[in-house]
């Protein structure tokens, strides 16, 4: 850590693989049990454990009976062969919890708002590094210490992911934090680094403008004048209620959004095309509109917008008639089925839907589910062109396992002149906080206030009752 170098994760995995602990969580075996199993079989990866099972070696391990062997076999059949990372939501929560327990700051991939993290990183300023490392080793969430030096240690968490802590002198905390935050490419371009107590001082001593952690992926990156912040959002334009697959009523969602400081909230429940959840037809939307009107009378000046997440049909038409959509304040369009269609076909369907004059935003354009489903084949260059022609904003969806558009695609969209809508896609009052992840993703892509539709006031979005049609 003093030199900016990080021990390769695969070196740690030869001693003890996080995969085994993660598998244990799947099959209901504790971390210590899985660690002992790994040591007894001399295996450190899921694939090695799979081989041991096929060779019949598990039966020789004390305490592994037929029932446990069957559970492990079932878990291995379900276990993904590709390496999984922690989502940004989970990596931030775990990093923050560990940091709070140690009086430290979290760094690494979590601090850079990476969509997936494969290692956590902490930095603690102290004059007693040994005591800090002892405290780290005793944390209930650290199941094993893999490596320990005079001022750093690497442990394995109950999540099956390595966590690295670096103890440094208070006067060099800023330097240590920057190195631990990374990326290695970004930091290497700044070396040699002066000692500094905080990052602001460090950048000043380097003669550079401060670079937010989210942008520290490539060497030489400089920040735009003002990245968008959570406080810049004036409303959330995508959430669900008990009218479809949500768990909060219109009133409950509105009250929670107001508590977060929003000025408005668009209710965007599903249409019937999404057959796996209840969908709203024309009369349902009108009845919901009556309920929204009552909530608005109660909560004014806070505004609940009549919206919909309108599914895109296989032929590119929308799953609601134009006269119904014309009554609404905000229309999100989205594709749920048919994500694996060929590139040209998929792009034609989505762009045709975007040309509907009532469409205002396109939800989760690339259709991915982190760790589970890859992006679809949608041609983003063509999508951007149609977005420019129609004025449809592209969503940065804040659901923890979506974050779609990704930060990389946000950067591409901004370069093309596209505007974004940062949404929670909340299905509960708690889910409204997802917008923080949308903001983090947009920031990582370089988005500023002017790039984001919902930094505007409600009057700029809705010009009259039922004013959801584009200009």
Question: Model-derived features: where do they sit?
Answer:
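Active-site catalytic microenvironments in core metabolic enzymes, especially phosphate/sugar-handling
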Residues: 307-310, 437
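Accessory alpha-helical DNA-binding modules that contact the DNA backbone or grooves
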Residues: 1-120, 124-153, 160-164, 173-175, ...
């Amino acid at each position: 850590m003093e030199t900016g170098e990080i021990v390769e994760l695969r070196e740690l995995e030869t001693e003890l693989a996080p995969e085994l602990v993660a598998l244990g969580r799947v099959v209901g075996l504790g971390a210590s049990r899985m660690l002992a199993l790994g040591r007894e079989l001399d295996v450190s990866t899921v694939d090695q454990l799979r081989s041991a099972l096929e060779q019949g070696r598990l039966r020789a391990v004390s305490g592994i009976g037929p029932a446990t062997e069957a559970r492990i076999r079932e878990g291995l059949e379900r276990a993904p062969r590709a390496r999984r990372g922690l989502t940004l939501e989970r990596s931030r929560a775990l990093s923050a919890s560990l940091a709070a327990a140690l009086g430290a700051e979290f760094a690494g991939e979590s601090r850079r708002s990476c969509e997936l993290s494969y290692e956590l990183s902490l930095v603690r300023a102290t004059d007693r590094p040994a005591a800090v490392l002892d405290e780290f080793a005793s944390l209930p969430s650290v199941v094993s210490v893999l490596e320990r030096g005079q001022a750093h240690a690497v442990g394995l968490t109950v999540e099956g992911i390595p966590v690295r802590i670096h103890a440094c002198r208070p006067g060099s905390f800023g330097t240590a934090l920057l190195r631990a935050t990374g990326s290695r490419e970004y930091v290497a371009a700044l070396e040699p680094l002066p000692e500094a107590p905080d990052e602001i001082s460090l950048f000043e001593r380097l003669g550079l403008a401060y670079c937010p952690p989210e942008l520290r992926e490539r060497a030489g990156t400089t920040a735009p004048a003002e990245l968008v912040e959570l406080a810049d959002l004036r409303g959330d334009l995508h959430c669900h209620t008990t009218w479809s697959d949500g768990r909060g009523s219109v009133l409950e969602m509105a009250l929670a959004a107001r508590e977060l400081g929003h000025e408005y909230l668009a209710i965007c429940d599903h249409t019937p095309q999404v057959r796996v959840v209840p969908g709203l037809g024309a009369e349902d939307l009108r009845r919901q509109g009556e309920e929204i009107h009552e909530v608005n009378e109660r909560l004014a000046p806070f505004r609940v917008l009549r919206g919909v997440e309108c599914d895109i049909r296989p032929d590119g038409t929308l799953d609601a008639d134009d006269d119904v959509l014309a009554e609404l304040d905000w229309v999100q369009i989205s594709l749920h089925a048919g994500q694996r269609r060929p590139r040209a076909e998929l792009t034609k369907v989505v762009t045709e839907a975007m040309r509907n004059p009532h469409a205002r935003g396109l939800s989760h354009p690339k259709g991915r589910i982190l760790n589970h489903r890859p992006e679809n084949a949608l041609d983003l260059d063509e999508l951007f062109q149609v977005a420019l022609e129609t004025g449809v904003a592209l969503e940065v969806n804040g659901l923890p396992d979506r974050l779609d558009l990704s930060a990389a695609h946000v950067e591409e969209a901004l370069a093309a002149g596209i505007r974004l809508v940062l949404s929670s896609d909340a299905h509960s009052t708690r889910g409204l906080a997802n917008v923080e992840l949308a903001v983090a993703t947009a920031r990582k892509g370089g988005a500023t206030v002017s790039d984001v539709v919902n930094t505007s006031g409600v009057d700029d979005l809705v010009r009259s009752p039922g004013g959801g049609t584009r200009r």
